[in-house]
């Protein structure tokens, strides 16, 4: 993505960062890694997906400098690069919860309205 009129490098950087987060499995990987480093094998066991899938998602996160890899003997261990990512995920969870509560309220109102007809 290149900057265009009205959009600077910082906005492009932010968009690329959030694009790297825009995958359900990558989000789940990060939710695990904010609690401590893990190997691909450990992530695979927790997530219930195959090793190539986990490795592919970690590669995307590494390319955007969201996670770091550290070799420990023959095992590579992954960790979030910035602990503040846990705060970002927590804020997002609160926003989503409020959105879902609003959606549930709207659905209840629609059901009540449907019953009156």
Predicted regions and their residues:
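N-terminal helix-turn-helix DNA-binding core of bacterial DNA-binding proteins
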Residues: 8-53, 72-85
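Residues at the C-terminal ends
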Residues: 35, 63-64
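Local alpha-helix boundary/kink/capping signal
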Residues: 58-59, 98
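Alpha-helical residues within the helix-turn-helix
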Residues: 45, 56, 62-63
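Amphipathic alpha-helical dimerization/coiled-coil segments
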Residues: 1-9, 13, 86-117
